[in-house]
Curated annotation (Swiss-Prot):
Residues carrying a glycan: N74, N103, N357
Encoding gene per record: Hyal2
Keyword Transferase belongs to the record: no
Protein name, as recorded: Hyaluronidase-2
Catalytic reactions of this protein: Random hydrolysis of (1->4)-linkages between N-acetyl-beta-D-glucosamine and D-glucuronate residues in hyaluronate
EC annotation from Swiss-Prot or TrEMBL: 3.2.1.35
Membrane topology: Lipid-anchor; GPI-anchor
Length: 473
C-alpha cells in the first residue's frame, strides 16, 4: 500500500507547491469569452435617428447606455437616484434621505433594492456588469475633503447635539466612528442584497479602488504617478468592501493637462496596478476581475484621445492584466449633428482600429501562451511592452457584409512574435486552471488524484481480502 500511494502523495505535493507559487486565479471572462473586452457605454443611440449619423459599434464586445429608460443591458449603472434611499446632500446643501449615512434608514432602504434591480436587470441570465455609482461621500472619513467635507461637518454636529459637554477631539472621534460604521453598513448590506437578487452579475462600486494620484497639477516635474502610501493603506482599510465585491471598477479618465505626455501613462498605470493589487490581495478564493472605466475624450471637453493616450489607457490596462475597459460618456456626445459626425470620424479612423488591434493581440496571447485558459500580464509592470499586433505579421481588413466583424486581423504570429510574448508576458489563469501556461485542469487533476487514491485503497483492500480468504481456507 505504501509503495502504491507514495508517487500519488508526491505528485499531490508537487502540484500543491506549484499551484501555490502562481498568481491567485481570476474569474473567467464573461460576454464573448475574450480575455480583454472593450465596452461602449455612451448614450449615442440618438445619432442615427435624430441627426442621420449612424455609428458602427460592431467592434465593441458590449454596447450599452447609462441613460434612464434602458433595461436588460449587459452593463447596468445604478446612480444614487436609481437604487434605494441613498443618504446624501444635494447641490443646494439640503439633506436627502438623512444626509449622512448614520442618519439614513437601512430598514427603509433595503426593501426598495429588489424592485430597482429587477426593473433594470429583468432576467437572471445572461451575466453582466452591475456598477453602483455612489460618489457623494466616501466610506473612509479622511477622504471626505473639499465639497465632501459637509459629511464630516454634519457628523460632528450630530454628535455635538447629543453631547454638548464633550470636548471637540472626543466629538470628532465619535463622529468618525459613527460615520464610517454607518457607511460600511450601507455599502455592505446594499452589495449583499443586490447580489442575492442577481447573483450571476458582477457587482462593484464605480471608482473603487481609487489611488488619488492627481498631484501632477502641483508637481509636474517630479510627478511619478505612484499612489501615495497613505492611500494604499486606506484602501487596505476597505478590505471589508473588496471581500464582498465581485468586480472592481477603477477610473482612468484623463485630464487634457496629461495629453501626449509620459505622465498620462504613469497616471493610468499606477491606478490600474492598485486595483489589481486590491483584486488579488483582498478576495479569498480568487482575484477579482478589474474593468477600467475610461472616456473617448479628455475630461470636461470633447477633444478625442490621441493615439499615444489610447495606448496609455487601453493598451496599458490590457498589458497589466485587466479584464477590460468600459468607455463611458454622457448625452453631450450625441447632442448635435457635428458631435455625432466628429465621433463617427474618430471611431472609424482611430478608436476602432486600435481596440481591434489590442483585443485580438490579447486573444492571440491567451491562445498561444495560456492555452486559452488565462490572460497575459506583463512580467514587469513598469516595462514599455504592450499587447499589439505586429504590423509585419498582421493587417486589419474590413468586413465584407454587415454580419461580419467591422475589422478583423489577417495574418499569423511569427516566431519573433511568439518569442516576444513569452519573454515579456506571463499567464494569469482563470479559476480551475493552473500551471505556467494554464495547462493544468485543477478539477480534473483533483479527480484523477482522488480516483488513483481510491484505486490504490481498493487494490489494498482486495489484497487483504484475498489474504484473509487464503488463511481461512
Amino acid at each position: 500500500m505504501r509503495a502504491g500511494l507514495g508517487p500519488i502523495i508526491t505528485l499531490a505535493l508537487v502540484l500543491e507547491v506549484a499551484w501555490a507559487s502562481e498568481l491567485k486565479p481570476t474569474a473567467p471572462p464573461i460576454f464573448t469569452g475574450r480575455p480583454f473586452v472593450v465596452a461602449w457605454n455612451v448614450p449615442t443611440q440618438e445619432c442615427a435617428p435624430r441627426h442621420k449619423v449612424p455609428l458602427d459599434l460592431r467592434a465593441f464586445d458590449v454596447e450599452a447606455t447609462p441613460n434612464e429608460g434602458f433595461f436588460n443591458q449587459n452593463i447596468t449603472t445604478f446612480y444614487y437616484d436609481r437604487l434605494g434611499l441613498y443618504p446624501r446632500f444635494d447641490a443646494a446643501g439640503m439633506s436627502v434621505h438623512g444626509g449622512v449615512p448614520q442618519n439614513g434608514s437601512l430598514c427603509a432602504h433595503l426593501p426598495m433594492l429588489k424592485e430597482a434591480v429587477e426593473r433594470y436587470i429583468q432576467t437572471q441570465e445572461p451575466a453582466g456588469l452591475a456598477v453602483i455609482d455612489w460618489e457623494e461621500w466616501r466610506p473612509v472619513w479622511v477622504r471626505n475633503w473639499q465639497e465632501k467635507d459637509v459629511y464630516r461637518q454634519s457628523s460632528r454636529q450630530l454628535v455635538a447635539s447629543r453631547h454638548p459637554d464633550w470636548p471637540s477631539d472626543r466629538i470628532v472621534k465619535q463622529a468618525q466612528y459613527e460615520f464610517e460604521f454607518a457607511a460600511r453598513q450601507f455599502m455592505l448590506n446594499t452589495l449583499r442584497y443586490v447580489k442575492a437578487v442577481r447573483p450571476q452579475h458582477l457587482w462593484g462600486f464605480y471608482l473603487f479602488p481609487d489611488c488619488y494620484n492627481h498631484d501632477y497639477v502641483q508637481n509636474w516635474d517630479s510627478y511619478t504617478g505612484r499612489c501615495p502610501d497613505v492611500e494604499v493603506a486606506q484602501n487596505d482599510q476597505l478590505a471589508w468592501l473588496w471581500a464582498e465585491n465581485t468586480a472592481l471598477f477603477p477610473s482612468v479618465y484623463l485630464d487634457k493637462t496629461l495629453a501626449s505626455s509620459k505622465h498620462s501613462r504613469n497616471f493610468v498605470s499606477f491606478r490600474v496596478q492598485e486595483a489589481l493589487r486590491v483584486a488579488h490581495t483582498h478576495h479569498a478564493n480568487h482575484a477579482l476581475p478589474v474593468y477600467v472605466f475610461t472616456r473617448p475624450t479628455y475630461t470636461r471637453r470633447l477633444t478625442e484621445l490621441n493615439q499615444m493616450d489610447l495606448i496609455s489607457t487601453i493598451g496599458e490596462s490590457a498589458a497589466l492584466g485587466s479584464a477590460g475597459v468600459i468607455f463611458w460618456g454622457d448625452s453631450v456626445y450625441a447632442s448635435s449633428m457635428e458631435n455625432c459626425q466628429n465621433l463617427k470620424k474618430y471611431l472609424t479612423q482611430t478608436l476602432v482600429p486600435y481596440i481591434v488591434n489590442v483585443s485580438w493581440a490579447t486573444q492571440y496571447c491567451s491562445w498561444t501562451q495560456c492555452h486559452g485558459h488565462g490572460r497575459c500580464v506583463r512580467r514587469n509592470p513598469s516595462a514599455s511592452t504592450f499587447l499589439h499586433l505586429s504590423p509585419s505579421s498582421f493587417r486589419l481588413v474590413p468586413g465584407r457584409t454587415p454580419s461580419e466583424p467591422q475589422l478583423r486581423p489577417e495574418g499569423e504570429l511569427s516566431e519573433d512574435d511568439l518569442s516576444y510574448l513569452q519573454m515579456h508576458f506571463r499567464c494569469h489563469c482563470y479559476l480551475g486552471w493552473g500551471g505556467e501556461q494554464c495547462q493544468w485542469n485543477h478539477k480534473r487533476a483533483a479527480g484523477d488524484a482522488s480516483r488513483a487514491w481510491a484505486g490504490a485503497h481498493l487494490a489494498s483492500l482486495l489484497g487483504l481480502v484475498a489474504m484473509t480468504l487464503t488463511w481461512t481456507l
